[in-house]
Amino acid sequence: MTRSTTPEGLRETILTISRDLLNEGGPSSLSMREVARRAGCTHQAPYHYFRGREAILVALVEEGYRALERALREAREMSEGRAPQDTTRAAGHAYLACALANPGVFRIMFRS
C-alpha cells in the first residue's frame, strides 16, 4: 500500500489495513507496527489518528454497525409492501452480506 498524502487519507488507509488484518487473522493479528508497515509510514504515525489498537477496533466496530444499519434499512425499504416473511428474508440476506464482507469486524461486533 502506498503512503497517503492527506491526513484523512492516511486515517482511512489505517482503517482499511486494520480491517484487512482482522479478516486475515483475527484480532491477534492487529498491531500498530504492522499497520504502519503496511501503510508505508513511520511506526508512530498511526498513533496520530488513534490512541492505540483498541481505538482502531472501536472505530471499525462503529463503522461496522453503521454499515449493518444501512444494509438493513435498505432491505426494509426494498421489501416494503411485501409479505412479512419477504422482509425477514431480505433482512437476513443483508445481515449475512455484511458478515461475509468483513468477517473479522463482524466477529468483534458480536463477540460475547
Question: What residues fall within each predicted segment?
Answer:
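N-terminal intrinsically disordered/low-complexity leader segments
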Residues: 1-9, 20, 80-81
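Solvent-exposed, amphipathic alpha-helical segments
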Residues: 17-25, 67-78
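Helix-turn-helix
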Residues: 13, 17, 21-55, 59
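Short, hydrophobic secondary-structure boundary micro-motifs
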Residues: 31, 106-110
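Short hydrophobic clusters on alpha-helical segments that form packing/core surfaces
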Residues: 14-22, 64, 95, 99
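Alpha-helical DNA-contacting segments of helix-turn-helix folds
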Residues: 22, 56-64, 72, 109
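Hydrophobic alpha-helical connector segments
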Residues: 73-105
